[in-house]
């Protein structure tokens, strides 16, 4: 008998690290994208929490009137936010080392850029990590394609819109009330409710919710019972089983009779592709709408679009919306602008009919 002994090739530190990063046997898959994702998302999260709790007021409008957004400066969970960086900074990259002091960096809203940039890099890497794990497991790439919709939406409001408007002070504040303020101002300045891409986005989000509820309720209503009446039907499912867990024929027949025959899918794969594609395409259009409105390609404007035989305007709901837009625009940055651009751009009307006699 002959025994052959081979010396085990010793792996270097880098090789062991690479094997650990790309191993699909780990409880948590890291991946090469994860090597960048983990530190960036941790940095964004830590900075967001600290800024939300303790950041001093920020001169967002660049007019020396700071706005407080942290909890320690009088806000609560609803009104608190990480305030966008100052309009005086504009689109300049503003890391800590660009400021003369930490106080100046905080006053000009430096934490906002730190959070947003690290967050965007992190979610981009999360998307890449989804693709990477799918590739290593032999899956198709639809998971990361679906996730690209919220990533595109985040990039639109945090990056593309500020670039189009010329300042990161126009980005969405990182808070609940700040988000609503961003929405109101966006409507006032761009009439987003009358933009077709926003309409497609609304159809995608609400339609996706409706289809998800319909699908879940149909499946739950047509489960194949594998248990006794005393046990929950959920116990009849075994993870990895080959048999169908619900009767798609019964669900198809029910829904086809409830609406009409061709409103129901008889192919499970087509059905689930539709459930994924509908909201994803809708959110893609929303992100595209934000991106084009960033460069002032705004929603439709129906100002006084209906007139009578005498040429007088017949006001419609569109005119009511336009008036609401003007009101919101007046309230926005009230100390920086006395009137919205729609009014300030017209010729000035004289205050008095004639010159006042100063000599009395």
From Swiss-Prot:
Subcellular location: Cell inner membrane
Enzyme Commission number, as recorded: 1.10.3.9
Membrane topology recorded in Swiss-Prot or TrEMBL: Multi-pass membrane protein
Site (Cleavage) residue list: 344-345
Propeptide: 345-360
One biological process term in Gene Ontology: photosynthetic electron transport in photosystem II
Binding site for [CaMn4O5] cluster: 170, 189, 332-333, 342, 344
Annotated keywords: Calcium, Cell inner membrane, Cell membrane, Chlorophyll, Chromophore, Electron transport, Herbicide resistance, Iron, Magnesium, Manganese, Membrane, Metal-binding, Oxidoreductase, Photosynthesis, Photosystem II, Transmembrane, Transmembrane helix, Transport
Free-text remark on how the cofactor is bound: The D1/D2 heterodimer binds P680, chlorophylls that are the primary electron donor of PSII, and subsequent electron acceptors. It shares a non-heme iron and each subunit binds pheophytin, quinone, additional chlorophylls, carotenoids and lipids. D1 provides most of the ligands for the Mn4-Ca-O5 cluster of the oxygen-evolving complex (OEC). There is also a Cl(-1) ion associated with D1 and D2, which is required for oxygen evolution. The PSII complex binds additional chlorophylls, carotenoids and specific lipids.
GO molecular function: chlorophyll binding; electron transporter, transferring electrons within the cyclic electron transport pathway of photosynthesis activity; iron ion binding; oxidoreductase activity, acting on diphenols and related substances as donors, oxygen as acceptor; oxygen evolving activity
SUPFAM superfamilies per record: Bacterial photosystem II reaction centre, L and M subunits
Residues the entry annotates as binding pheophytin a: 126
EC class: oxidoreductase
Site annotation Stabilizes free radical intermediate: residues: 190
Entry's Gene Ontology cellular component terms: photosystem II; plasma membrane
Transcription regulation as UniProt keyword: no
Residues annotated for Fe cation binding in this entry: 215, 272
Substrates-to-products reaction catalysed: 2 a plastoquinone + 4 hnu + 2 H2O = 2 a plastoquinol + O2
Broad class of where this protein is predominantly found: membrane
Binding residues annotated for chlorophyll a PD1, in chain numbering: 198
Ligand binding (a quinone): 215, 264-265
Subunit structure: PSII is composed of 1 copy each of membrane proteins PsbA, PsbB, PsbC, PsbD, PsbE, PsbF, PsbH, PsbI, PsbJ, PsbK, PsbL, PsbM, PsbT, PsbX, Psb30/Ycf12, peripheral proteins PsbO, CyanoQ (PsbQ), PsbU, PsbV and a large number of cofactors. It forms dimeric complexes.
Something else known: Cyanobacteria usually contain more than 2 copies of the psbA gene.
Function: Photosystem II (PSII) is a light-driven water:plastoquinone oxidoreductase that uses light energy to abstract electrons from H(2)O, generating O(2) and a proton gradient subsequently used for ATP formation. It consists of a core antenna complex that captures photons, and an electron transfer chain that converts photonic excitation into a charge separation. The D1/D2 (PsbA/PsbD) reaction center heterodimer binds P680, the primary electron donor of PSII as well as several subsequent electron acceptors.
Family: Belongs to the reaction center PufL/M/PsbA/D family.
Protein name, entry field: Photosystem II protein D1 1
Organism: Gloeobacter violaceus (strain ATCC 29082 / PCC 7421)
């Amino acid at each position: 008998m002959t025994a052959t002994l081979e010396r085990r090739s010793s792996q270097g530190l880098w090789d062991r690290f690479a094997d650990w990063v790309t191993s699909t046997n780990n409880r948590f898959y890291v991946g090469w994208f994860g090597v960048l994702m983990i530190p960036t998302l941790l940095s964004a999260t830590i900075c967001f929490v600290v800024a939300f709790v303790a950041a001093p007021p920020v001169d967002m409008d660049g007019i020396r009137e700071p706005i407080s957004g942290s909890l320690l400066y009088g806000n609560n969970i609803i009104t608190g936010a990480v305030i966008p960086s100052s309009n005086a900074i504009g689109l300049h990259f503003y890391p800590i080392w660009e400021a003369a002091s930490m106080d100046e960096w905080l006053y000009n809203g430096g934490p906002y850029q730190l959070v947003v940039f690290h967050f965007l890099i992190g979610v981009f890497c999360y998307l890449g990590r989804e693709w990477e794990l799918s590739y290593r497991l032999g899956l198709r790439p639809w998971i990361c394609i679906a996730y690209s919709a919220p990533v595109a939406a985040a990039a639109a409001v945090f990056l593309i819109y500020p670039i189009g408007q010329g300042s990161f002070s126009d980005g969405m504040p990182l808070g609940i009330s700040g988000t609503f303020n961003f929405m109101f101002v966006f409507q006032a300045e761009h009439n987003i409710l009358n933009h077709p891409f926003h309409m497609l986005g609304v159809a995608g989000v609400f339609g996706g919710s409706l289809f998800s509820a319909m699908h879940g309720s149909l499946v739950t209503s047509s489960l194949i019972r594998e248990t006794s009446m005393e046990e929950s039907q959920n116990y009849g499912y075994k993870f990895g089983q080959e048999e169908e867990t619900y009767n798609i024929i019964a669900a198809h027949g029910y829904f086809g009779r409830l609406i009409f025959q061709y409103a129901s899918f008889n192919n499970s794969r087509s059905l689930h592709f539709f459930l994924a594609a509908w909201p994803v395409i809708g959110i893609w259009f929303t992100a595209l709408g934000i991106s084009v409105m960033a460069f002032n390609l705004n929603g439709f404007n129906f100002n006084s679009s209906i007139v009578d035989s005498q040429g007088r305007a017949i006001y419609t709901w569109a005119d009511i919306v336009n008036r609401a837009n003007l009101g919101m625009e007046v309230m926005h940055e009230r100390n920086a602008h006395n009137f919205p651009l729609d009014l300030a751009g017209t010729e000035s009307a004289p205050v008095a009919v004639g010159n006042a006699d100063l000599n009395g």
